[in-house]
Amino acid sequence: MTEGVTIRQIEQELGRLRHAAAAPGSAPNLRTSVMTHLAWVPERWVDAATDTLAGMGERHPSRTILLLPRPDDPRDALDGEVDLRCFVRAGEQGQVCSEVISLGLCGPRAKAPGSVAMPLLIPDLPVFLRWRGEPWFGDPALDQLTEIADRLVLDSDEWGECDATMTQLPQLFDRVAISDIAWAKVQPWREACAALWPDIGEADSLRVAGPRGETLLLWGWLRARLRRELELEHEPAGEVELVAIDGEDVPAPRAKRTSSSDLLSDQLEIFGRDRIYEEAVSSLAAVPA
């Protein structure tokens, strides 16, 4: 990554790569984008974000802008790197290429990502923001990026303080449409619980062995749907292994292994607000302390 770059230099490098990709004598490369994909990636999440990005290009070609906050860097600077990532589509000549822009936001720049990202957005295409880790509530970075994004994609399984973060999340609902990857992961269990209707309507307790984020979302969903209090018992686990209602195990749905790339790609196909998700999270905010 080159240190001390400007947005103008990033734009010039994009142009150079496009020109090089169209070199005479070779099969033409099609540069295509269906969106701008912003990703806010604190240092601890860089490897996971890179792995996820590697599997997304063919399904959702986009201009990806990786925003790498470095608030403790003593410099007031922007570091940058531009790359074209190309792949072959079956039955087509040449390659389809997407642009990946990596930007290190050093020192004060970590507080002003909106002014960095805005000039690089593709006009008239939707903007999806993948925020890695816990949202920085009250921080200018979150405020600026949700202002320019059409959809905010989170994963509550990434949150260390999951309970507290859930109670703050409703403040974003009227500002930006939200997806939660943990909500998608727990969908088969929600469907399995719904199949127990009408008996589940009298439920008093829920027991879940699984990640805290998915557990809270399942609990909040049941509270919101049944409009009643439920006692929660949680056992930590890497994935949801067991759900029990009033001591009776819910039949486990068929296991489906989905990559992190596919989980994120699924969220990039959703545009409207998910009111059922919002109600589930809002019910958690109403839980007495």
Predicted regions and their residues:
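Extended, compositionally simple fibrous regions characteristic of intermediate-filament-like scaffolds
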Residues: 87-89, 173-184, 200, 256-257, ...
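A generic structural motif
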Residues: 63-73, 130-132, 154-159, 177-181, ...
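Internal, hydrophobic cores of structured domains that mediate oligomerization or house catalytic pockets
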Residues: 98-193
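Short N-terminal or domain-adjacent regulatory/targeting segments
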Residues: 1-32, 180-196, 270-289
